[in-house]
Amino acid sequence: ALLNWNDVTPHSIDHKAPSRGQVIPALIDSRSLSDLHAVFDVSNFKGMMPFRLVGVFPSEQEIWEWRWDSKQLGFQAHMWESRHWFSSSLSDDRAESLRGAACRSAQHESFAGSVPWLRRLHASHAGGPGPFSLCVHRKDVKTLSYSEIMVTAGNVQMGHFRGSPCTMAQIDPIEIERADCLDPAVWGISTAAS
C-alpha cells in the first residue's frame, strides 16, 4: 500500500519530479522482501513528495513500512499481526488516532476479519460523517471508491466499487487462478518478438 505522508514537511521538491504513483509499478515484480530491497537499492525517489509504503510478506511473515521524507528512505519492521495505516491531507496523526480507534473497537465484533465486516468497517462513519471517519465526507473531499483483493492458495479475486463505501450495494468481483497471474496473455500482453 502506498500512502501520502502529509505530516512531514518536504525538502525542496521539483514539481517536474516523478510522481509517487510511479513507486508501485517499479516494485510490482518483487516476489519477496529481498526482491523489494534489491529494487529499493536502485530506485531513485529524488524529488518525490513524502510517502509511506507498506509491504506484507506472508512467506516471511513480515510487515515492513518504508518512509520517504523527500530526502532519505527509512524503514521499520512491524509485528506479524493485523494492522491499519491511514493518511489524511489534514493530519495523518489525527486520522491514525480517530480511524484507528474505530478499527480497534470493531476488532472485538464477533465476525471481525470477515469480508462483510471489512466492507462495513470501510463504510463506517464512527464519530459522525466527517474528515476523519473511515468513509470520508468533507466539503471538498470524499472517499471515491472501495477495492478489495482476496488471495487464496489457488485464486486471486478483485472487486471494486466506484463511490463512497457507505453507498455500496454490491461488488461483482473478477477471479483468476494464481497460476494465470504470471501469464502475460491473461493481461493482453504480447510476448512475441517484434
Task: Name each region found by the language model.
Residues 1-194:
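N-terminal nucleophile
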